[in-house]
Amino acid sequence: MKENIREEEILKIVKEYGEVSRLELAETFGLTSARISKVTKNLLEKKIIIEKSVGESSGGRPPVYLSINNEKFKDILGINLTSNRMLYITLGKINGEIFKKKKIAIDLLSKDEQEDILKVVDDIIGKEISQNPNIGALSIIITGSVDEEKGVSVMSPHYSLKTPKVVEYFERKYNLPVLLENDVRAMALVEKQIGSCRNVKNFVVFNLGEGIGSANCIDKKIYKGHNSMAGEAGHIVINTNSIRKCSCGKRGCLEAESSEMAIIKKITSEIKIGKYSILKDILKEKEFLTIKDILYGVKKRDFLVIQVMTEAMEYIARGLNILISVLDPEKIILVGEIFSSKFLMDTLKFELNKISLDVHSYAIEPTKLGEDLYFYSQ
């Protein structure tokens, strides 16, 4: 049983559920009702949360539901370090209202800044706090494995961190509560609160950018797993004969075969050894390709691009089929630029239909939130 719990963890669950009883909080964290009551009492005294309503009694005392006190809570500064090489910054309220947002392309930062991304985040926080003294909390979203209870970034394949103790570092420096979360789990919360899964009990969010990750909502709860590593779909080995090495050290991972980076590398390599493609001139001019170039090749039905992308969709279908077979979701939300292509979506569905069980009934669709998903994932 867990002995200690931070107020920020309680707030996160109250925000996620909208209204939640002390008993539900105790069950969520594996704590006694007395311990939960002690923490919630502090939050009630600070007027950060309020007793919103009384539920129906099942024989004993009726449950009292707690919710966030939007009027009391100060502004939240959110920083989202995504897998698509973009840094999204938002300033808003805990109820999801955003009144300031901007984004920074990671590739436009200097080499030193890219190698010390926490300093970049630190500079942003310092600047925003100096301009807005009403900021009362920080929310940091990052790719990879996150232990939000300890406030630690266990492993981020896309960012170099000088210290994994992200929460401790920023709480000490700014004397503000700091929430830390994995990027795809944050996306799942957004889809659950304002997206296509508001009334869906069981769903999967599958994110494809430079890397691949997923988040699973089971019976309306975001599932994290024993080590807070549930959802590492990118590291499912789907090609045991592969020579492509993944960032995790294994070969044949879904991420190494079908992420944006993997797709670009494959097509670039094929062009360089002499394979024909309409992207050859683009590669020669820019010396690199982007996922937009790949989608242009798909639109023009370039043979090489279609060949590589069809294989990528086949591997993605294999990975999704494993998730479908194990989790039996009602809906799958796809996040990533490649899913904007109807041709690729049709190809993915075709490949899934070939291997998935007929008894599985589910909807699969790209997120309807577009780029706003990254801004709201704070």
Per-range role (PLM):
Residues 1-61, 65-105, 109-134, 250, ...:
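ATP-binding/phosphotransfer module of carbohydrate and carboxylate kinases, centering on a glycine-rich
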Residues 57, 145-148, 186-188, 213-214, ...:
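Short, active-site-adjacent cap segments at secondary-structure transitions
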Residues 76-80, 135-139, 203-207, 213-215:
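Short glycine-aspartate micro-motif
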Residues 93, 148, 217:
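Short, acidic, Ser/Thr-enriched surface-loop or helix-capping motifs
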Residues 96-97, 152, 221:
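Residue-level signal for well-ordered, solvent-exposed loop/turn and beta-edge residues enriched
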Residues 101, 113, 173-296:
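Glycine/GP-enriched mid-protein hinge/lid loop-to-helix segment characteristic of carbohydrate kinases
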